[in-house]
Amino acid sequence: MAWNVDFYQDDDGKLPVMKWLDTLPEEVRGKVIARIDLLKEGGPTLDYPYTSQIDGRLREIRLRVGKTRYRVLYFFDDDRTAILLHGLTKNTPAVEEADKRIGSARMAKHEARLGSKRSAGARRGKGEGNK
C-alpha cells in the first residue's frame, strides 16, 4: 500500500522543505527524493537506516553523501499522511535542538490546522442534519 506524503506549508504559503531541496546539488536532491519515495512505499514501517525516531512522533529521513548528512524531519498525521516538516544539512551525527524545535513547532501547527478543519466539518455536518 502506498502512503501519502505531503509538504508542510507555512502561513504565507511557502514550502520550507521544497525550498531546502532546491538548494541541494542535483545529485543529492535526487537521492533525497528517492528516500522520500521509499517513505511513500514503506510508510511507518520504514525504519533504520532510512529513517529513525527523533522525539515522540517526530522522525527523520536519513541520508549520507560523503561526510555530509542530509535529514528531512517528518511525522505521520491523523490522516495517515507523512508531513515533511524541515530539511537540514549537517556534518555532525546528532540533530541540533534548534532543528528539533522547528520540526516540533511545525508539527504542532499542522495538527492545529487539521483539528480546525475537522471541527469545522463536524459543525457543518451537525447543521445539515437539522434542516
Language-model segments: what does each one mean?
Residues 1-69, 78-82, 89-131:
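Basic, Lys/Arg-enriched alpha-helical interface segments
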